[in-house]
Amino acid sequence: MSLLEVSDLSVVFPGGRGTLPWQRLPNVRAVQGANLSIRASESVGLVGESGSGKTTLGRAILRLLHPTEGTIRLGDFDVTGFGRRTPRAYRKAVQVVFQDPVGSLNPAMTVRDIVAEPLRLNMGLQGEALDERSAELMGLVGLEAHHLDRYPYEFSGGQRQRIAIARALATTPELLVLDEPVSALDVSTQSQVINLLERLQRETDAAYLFIAHDLAVVRHVCQRIAVMYHSRIVETGPADAICDDPAHPYTALLIASIPDPDPAVQREKTSRRRALGRGVAGATGAPPVNACPFAARCPHVMDICHTSFPTPIATAAGGEVACHLHTTGPMLGGRPLSELDPDTDEA
């Protein structure tokens, strides 16, 4: 049974005013028809380039914004049925670690105040019990109890992110939303924080929604991956299957974008990346409503891709892919995507 179940979720932001008083800008469809599930104690990665809608989806799960359509369920909670007020029990069950460890910590508060705040508000701890639990959380993330009396500016970026993780773990959450938790850190610090997150999951049994743009990092941390492009989830599946045998052309493009230390391999990857993306740098304009968002960049594009978004179908690896290549194109007979030459194959 799934801990989190997101069904047909859409988030549409209203367009603002144009240059002239009577002009209205079109609505922005940040997320369209998203389906995602996370089991208890499972790590699921949500990957995609900037502007794909992955952070918006995470914020909808956190109740930091209200979805336009669809449902979100967390265990017994019907999240989309809460109305304007969010129950305290849901706040305890779902916590977040933001990308920027500097901006997410109040510089006017000591670490003790930062870590203790959710303990007071949600757990009702006070006095000695509050101090003991705060010190315990600091030890859990590899910091000392004496660090509690310092301010955020006295710590490095990696230490600040550890403090943010300690704060998120204070309520013993069932689900932790990690919004690019290592993107703002240097490489050596990234590995330390990733190892910390893996250890903490084993110790706490919390489920992770790991939002990132680095597929290599997500593969290391997560059991399953969902790939998002320009408001749509285009592929889901086990992490190894997604990375070793992608079923969607955009997933293949992401994998080809991972740097390789071998110059010969890197040249081959660069050539494949350019072919897969048709030389287009990234998604531009508003996401289409009734078309595949990757159609403008896909080397295997067909006429149907411009007129309808494909219904996701099951893959052999146990995931799903939303691509017309698997329903009406050359992969209908089971031909793997890796055999399609983006330079010569006409879908």
Label the model's feature ranges.
Residues 2, 15-22, 27, 238-347:
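Short catalytic/signature loops enriched in Gly
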Residues 20-25, 79-95, 113, 121, ...:
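ABC ATPase NBD coupling module
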Residues 70-81:
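Conserved ABC transporter NBD signature motif
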Residues 77-78, 128-146, 255-256:
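Conserved ABC ATPase "signature" region
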Residues 151-155, 159:
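Conserved ABC ATPase signature
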Residues 170-174:
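A short, proline-enriched helix->beta-strand linker immediately N-terminal to the Walker B motif
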Residues 175-177, 181-267:
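P-loop NTP-binding/switch modules centered on Walker-like glycine-rich loops
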